[in-house]
Amino acid sequence: MPELPEVETLKNSLKDKLIGLIIENVELKRDNLRYKLSPLLATETLNTNILDVRRRAKYLIIDFNNDYSLIVHLGMSGRFTLQSANYKTQKHDHVIFDLSNGEKLIFNDTRRFGMIYSFKTDLLEKEFLNDLGIEPFSDLLTLEYLKDKLQTKKIPIKNLIMDNRVIVGVGNIYASESLHLARIHPDKSGNNLRDDEIENLIKAIRDVLTKAITAGGTTLKDFVNGDNKPGYFTKQLKVYGREGQSCLSCSSTIIKIKHSGRSTFYCKTCQYS
């Protein structure tokens, strides 16, 4: 599932190309997605001018001049790409936006777990994104904030940093990578972390996410940016997906365990605490 770096990469690849364009036609191809397409999606975006392209958590948001916004979540396999005027529709294309420069903006989702909605811009934070925690790069993510969130939690720290009500955008890949960089065992209870460990973890999360964004995200199978290019952070993964291989820091064997049904990868030597 695309995480914060992938959505940030998608935003960066689309923003300068979309701002100022007009949506001249909207085609809804099918409605049998997990989150069904609303007919209002077409009427609330048609003939609008694109003002901004931004990200909140794992959501891509496109703001229009009619006080509506488009909210896109890629789900497991979603793609949101720019295509040329002579693009041939593909099997899993669900929404096609014809743009005023002749290009097409395509929402494609093979597994159909993604979502694409239109919503009043001024109500987004109050009614749609209201349960989300703070951004990893926000100045609000401090020792005091995270310590307060962790002090009563007796569940594994990996689960806690993946909780979007606490910190947004840190999915399975980057949680494993961040904990390895911070040298914290993924099973350690949140309320048992020392202050220095919390500070190291905040820094590690930011460092890992920054490197992933610079590399264009992580493509394990489906992810591409708006220009149809994959992410290359896969080549920099230290533990994720490396079960049985040697740790790149100490040469111990990478171990795989399960947390809430998700695979977790760690090094028992580096992550002893």
From Swiss-Prot:
This is Formamidopyrimidine-DNA glycosylase. Keywords: DNA damage, DNA repair, DNA-binding, Glycosidase, Hydrolase, Lyase, Metal-binding, Multifunctional enzyme, Zinc, Zinc-finger. A zinc finger (FPG-type) spans 238-272. GO terms for molecular function: 8-oxo-7,8-dihydroguanine DNA N-glycosylase activity; class I DNA-(apurinic or apyrimidinic site) endonuclease activity; damaged DNA binding; zinc ion binding. Gene3D superfamilies: 1.10.8.50, MutM-like, N-terminal (3.20.190.10). Its cofactor is Zn(2+). It catalyses: Hydrolysis of DNA containing ring-opened 7-methylguanine residues, releasing 2,6-diamino-4-hydroxy-5-(N-methyl)formamidopyrimidine; 2'-deoxyribonucleotide-(2'-deoxyribose 5'-phosphate)-2'-deoxyribonucleotide-DNA = a 3'-end 2'-deoxyribonucleotide-(2,3-dehydro-2,3-deoxyribose 5'-phosphate)-DNA + a 5'-end 5'-phospho-2'-deoxyribonucleoside-DNA + H(+). Binds 1 zinc ion per subunit. The keyword DNA-binding applies. Pfam families: Fapy_DNA_glyco, H2TH, zf-FPG_IleRS. One of its GO terms (biological process) is base-excision repair. Signal peptide: none annotated. Its EC number is 3.2.2.23, 4.2.99.18. Involved in base excision repair of DNA damaged by oxidation or by mutagenic agents. Acts as a DNA glycosylase that recognizes and removes damaged bases. Has a preference for oxidized purines, such as 7,8-dihydro-8-oxoguanine (8-oxoG). Has AP (apurinic/apyrimidinic) lyase activity and introduces nicks in the DNA strand. Cleaves the DNA backbone by beta-delta elimination to generate a single-strand break at the site of the removed base with both 3'- and 5'-phosphates. Belongs to the FPG family. Monomer. InterPro entries: DNA_glyclase/AP_lyase_DNA-bd (IPR015886), DNA_glyclase_Znf_dom_DNA_BS (IPR015887), Formamido-pyr_DNA_Glyclase (IPR020629), FPG_cat (IPR012319), MutM-like_N-ter (IPR035937), Ribosomal_uS13-like_H2TH (IPR010979), Znf_DNA_glyclase/AP_lyase (IPR000214), Znf_FPG/IleRS (IPR010663). DNA binds at H92, R111, K153. The active site is at P2 (schiff-base intermediate with dna), E3 (proton donor), K58 (proton donor), R262 (proton donor). It comes from the Bacteria. It comes from Rickettsia conorii (strain ATCC VR-613 / Malish 7).
